[in-house]
UniProtKB/Swiss-Prot annotation:
<protein>
    <recommendedName>
        <fullName>Ribonuclease PH</fullName>
        <ecNumber>2.7.7.56</ecNumber>
    </recommendedName>
</protein>
<keyword id="KW-0694">RNA-binding</keyword>
<dbReference type="InterPro" id="IPR050080">
    <property type="entry name" value="RNase_PH"/>
</dbReference>
<dbReference type="Pfam" id="PF03725">
    <property type="entry name" value="RNase_PH_C"/>
</dbReference>
<dbReference type="InterPro" id="IPR001247">
    <property type="entry name" value="ExoRNase_PH_dom1"/>
</dbReference>
<dbReference type="InterPro" id="IPR027408">
    <property type="entry name" value="PNPase/RNase_PH_dom_sf"/>
</dbReference>
<dbReference type="InterPro" id="IPR002381">
    <property type="entry name" value="RNase_PH_bac-type"/>
</dbReference>
<dbReference type="InterPro" id="IPR015847">
    <property type="entry name" value="ExoRNase_PH_dom2"/>
</dbReference>
<feature type="binding site">
    <location>
        <begin position="124"/>
        <end position="126"/>
    </location>
    <ligand>
        <name>phosphate</name>
    </ligand>
</feature>
<keyword id="KW-0820">tRNA-binding</keyword>
<keyword id="KW-0819">tRNA processing</keyword>
<dbReference type="GO" id="GO:0008033">
    <property type="term" value="P:tRNA processing"/>
</dbReference>
<comment type="subunit">
    <text>Homohexameric ring arranged as a trimer of dimers.</text>
</comment>
<dbReference type="GO" id="GO:0000175">
    <property type="term" value="F:3'-5'-RNA exonuclease activity"/>
</dbReference>
<keyword id="KW-0698">rRNA processing</keyword>
<dbReference type="Pfam" id="PF01138">
    <property type="entry name" value="RNase_PH"/>
</dbReference>
<dbReference type="InterPro" id="IPR020568">
    <property type="entry name" value="Ribosomal_Su5_D2-typ_SF"/>
</dbReference>
Length: 238
């Protein structure tokens, strides 16, 4: 039994609230336990210079954390004058994950800009961001279809993400901050609903991990992500 009462293979309480911000084409509040992220999807009728005239669209992402989303205040990256390496890595991961399930040709020469803003962090902010951003993206693209801008929804399949780690020798799904801080191994899995991987990130903090342990973490992640797909579908059906 974990500190929050969960079993080793259990997700935290997951909630996805759609239409959370009225101005964005797509906007959700996604909650993985005490981790809360606002994800918005904004449509622009233009593409980056490297795509102009090529008849294809683009999906990209930005990620940030509210200064007091963590236990102690962190200054805004804008105030420091540059984006940190962690932020750059996470927003590239979010963008890659969403492009993997978007038909960019069907999207046409327009862009969808995803903004993921962490308002409370308790571990797993990048995985929550990907899971919530997918729902915001679908809502934004549905709106384009309803307006007659697009003939079909340019979504090929769903995408979601979850963390898995080894804490005190045990494989745990969807780590909170305390567990993540104590983890001997930390992995993030991003998968599509056809059971294909977009990205797998894994790091041993102390002892290297075995193939058997990695396989165990993969199995736990796949089971967890399948549950996330069900939660996404339920949210989109409301």
């Amino acid at each position: 039994m974990r500190s929050d009462g969960r079993e080793a293979g259990s997700l935290r309480g997951i909630n996805i609230t759609r239409h959370y911000i009225k101005h964005a084409e797509g906007a959700v509040l996604v909650e993985f336990g005490d981790t809360k992220v606002i994800c918005t999807a904004s449509v622009e009728e233009s593409v980056p210079p490297f795509l102009r005239g090529k008849g294809t669209g683009w999906v990209t992402a930005e990620y940030s954390m509210l200064p007091r989303s963590t236990h102690t205040r962190s200054s805004r990256e804008a105030a420091r004058g540059k984006i940190g390496g962690r932020t750059h890595e996470i927003q590239r991961l979010i963008g890659r994950s969403l492009r993997a399930v978007t038909d960019l040709t069907l999207l046409g020469e327009r862009s969808v800009l995803i903004d993921c803003d962490v308002i409370q962090a308790d571990g797993g902010t990048r995985t929550a961001s990907i899971t919530g951003a997918y729902v915001a993206l679908v809502d934004a693209l549905h709106l384009l279809v309803e307006r007659g801008v697009l003939p079909l929804l340019p979504i090929k399949e769903a995408v979601a993400a979850v963390s898995v780690g080894i804490v005190d020798g045990n494989i745990l799904l969807d780590l909170n901050y305390v567990e993540d801080s104590a983890a001997e191994v930390d992995m993030n899995f991003v998968m599509t609903s056809s059971d294909r991987f977009v990205e797998v990130q894994g790091t041993a903090e102390s002892e290297p991990f075995t193939v058997e342990q990695m396989d165990g973490m993969r199995v736990a992640a796949v089971e967890g992500i399948r549950k996330l797909f069900s939660i996404q579908n339920e949210a989109l059906s409301r």
